[in-house]
């Protein structure tokens, strides 16, 4: 029963309060630790950087996993209510729904006002690509891509690892995800971030595909195309550089009947409907419904695991 209460309370906290300020957010501190360790990672050659990257990931995972594990174990033995509340707060900090929704809706409102310059600026908080010259359709596409991809690593994956490993496990997952977002790139971080990038790919392998299935089911509710979601999911999921990101993005593109293109990298879906500011709202409804489906599945897993 405790795990179900933690799960549901964390969702309520997200809906009511959203994301906490960076001063209280563990992901912000993960980023600071990574930046601190990163400086010493370039002192040697390729082999040194690769090994250093492995040690850096494992050490940082332990740095957040171990204190959280013992803190919650101690609280559980003292007061179950305090244990549930603290666990829910920590768990909520490992996933995001409300914050992304607000950011996407802000971009939609700016585009509706034809404030392209400000929309480009705000979009930088959602994507890593250069937004300075993107026209409106590409801005919409980038926002929709971010919304679709986020359900995988931002919601389904944290809940998935919570069900298996509890709050400490989600913290460890979030460390790897943060590493990947900061150093999991080619070029400068080719060897330093290689382990983090591959580890993140492995951890998100199942959640990414589960998120695509949730989007597919959600496409049956509303003015979406389930047939398109199914077809594009299988046709285009492998077009992205990431082995995981393409699954939810391609499925969403098919359901929305739009083409999501990152110029020079990939093109997902067919250009059946135009990319309009309203498309962002449609994508949010689709992804929210997919998230609700995953919540129902998770609650079912918790319930049947309890009575088994």
UniProtKB/Swiss-Prot annotation:
Transferase among the record's keywords? no
The membrane spanning regions, by residue number, are 1-21, 50-70, 71-91, 151-171, 202-222, 284-304
UniProt entry tagged with the keyword 4Fe-4S: no
A single Gene Ontology MF term assigned here is: threonine-phosphate decarboxylase activity
Q: In which pathway does it act?
A: Cofactor biosynthesis; adenosylcobalamin biosynthesis
- Specify the protein's topology with respect to the membrane: Multi-pass membrane protein
What compartments host this protein?
Cell membrane
Per its UniProt entry, which superkingdom is the organism in? Bacteria
This protein's GO cellular component annotations are: plasma membrane
* GO process annotations (BP): cobalamin biosynthetic process
Q: Cite the entry's keywords alphabetically.
A: Cell membrane, Cobalamin biosynthesis, Membrane, Transmembrane, Transmembrane helix
Function per UniProt: Converts cobyric acid to cobinamide by the addition of aminopropanol on the F carboxylic group.
Instruction: Give the family per the record.
Output: Belongs to the CobD/CbiB family.
- Protein name as catalogued: Cobalamin biosynthesis protein CobD
Q: Which organism is it from?
A: Dehalococcoides mccartyi (strain CBDB1)
The organism's taxonomy opens as: Bacteria, Bacillati, Chloroflexota, Dehalococcoidia, Dehalococcoidales
